[in-house]
């Protein structure tokens, strides 16, 4: 422990706790504070509580965080940090622990002396968790004692009291989310596990243990998972890229501080063609990028360009190919993780996940520029491999432009015209319209007849959709099935510069783009192919909240005069339990299994899958970009075994047809 840390440890007391506002507002308008009141908001409570412990870890005082999902769906988070101060708060005249737990925005993270940087996107602190819980209990291990206070809906039940002695330090929080506020109070293990894994990678050396005490249907308990990454981002980039083939061996890594900004980067080049950069600020995934990402891209391109200009062999290759290398070319087949720590981050953008601090751009440029120049000089073999891939990317980019232009020449209408197979809607206001991408001609026929022509368009997809995970950029524009989708929805490329790979959605023709496929394994594979196309080539559509998946029913259950469509095996069982159980005349039960969309007549398809009043739509979102990247590369990659395991685990219908 450094002298500075020792002084901080001794001085972390009530005077470091800053107070900003009260809790009533949180219960009145919870979505303002945690994003929403559905599954996402529910899991945000865990993140907000764990962030307190991560702040202790980033300050150098905590090495182990234990997260437990209890049998009653409450959550316990315990760390071995210094423990929240319990002495009296000067202004509030009550225990600092009570202030932290009951006043919004109160905490060490708002006092620069306690934490130089602090995690948490909303930064509302653990008091917000308290306000949105029916019950919460805080225990602090500090000064040789165990201090405790309990709360109901954010209000203390008694003053902070000593309930025992201890020789350890740290904080333990347990909370029960309020079912009158959240639409669900059931925690999903996988969502919590993904975030804990991410935090362990972003904070090298810390150990996070995740335990689920809820037994499964057979009464078995899941084994606790321990997340620990000694090498941090180096392990993270390997994890994200584990289904791809690296062309440079070990990741290129840097960990430094420039202009007061701690910067960490790990990157790999692989044999694929997509660019996957995941950026973080204070452990927050900046999905929309920002100044740290801009600085990284500029420095990387500059270093590689300088190297290829100064190397005779590479320079001759570029001259022979008659190409001009563009910035995008330097990032084809690149996977990178960038993590910066910023004392006062300014977030911008649609989802407040874009870093706006201008000083970070220069700091990252310096750090990455120096590290890349050194690496390229010391690793000439790898440097040549990367630069040769860049030259190939530039060649493919020019081929893509030609392919795109030839498609647009064939269709002289604006934007390349509309495909002949598109059955468009009569309404021309995009915000009121939606398009269904439907698997196969027969289902497309039913969908065309069953739709509301005023606002619903249908594009039948014939033949196999191209797996874009494994192809060069220009091949996408040569595939008719892909171009039909791009032209139908109104996405344009080359708007921000003729060779730009950014998809422009300013002239998107529909507010909702709905993938509609059969409820079987083949259907889920087609879903995945289309989602991969959007994720890799048109992520702006997903980020704008425009991509959805339709959920056709698996069964129609009829018993006497009762009839219901069932979308899951559980719903079918619930129907049987409700109407048939105990009835000796069970022969009256009729179950129709829909294997494909084409088996439904147009009225049934409208009633179950297309009518906005009844249908079940799943919105495609990218909550965790690094996790999504790893999943898509696994699903669409060459290795069959992990793909089969994933589909069997995640497609509830996979075992029905097996």
Could you tell me what each predicted segment is?
Residues 28-46:
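Conserved short strand/loop->alpha-helix "switch" segment adjacent to the catalytic nucleotide/phosphoryl-transfer site
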Residues 90, 348-361, 565-571, 575-579:
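Helical (often loop-to-helix) elements that flank the catalytic cores of nucleotide-handling enzymes
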Residues 83-88:
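A short glycine-centered beta->alpha linker in the GHKL/HATPase_c
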Residues 1-16, 23, 47, 55-57, ...:
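GHKL-family ATPase ATP-binding module
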Residues 395-414, 429-434, 445, 449-451, ...:
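C-terminal interaction appendages of subunits in large macromolecular complexes
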Residues 89-90, 97:
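Short adenine-binding "F-helix/F-box" segment of the Bergerat
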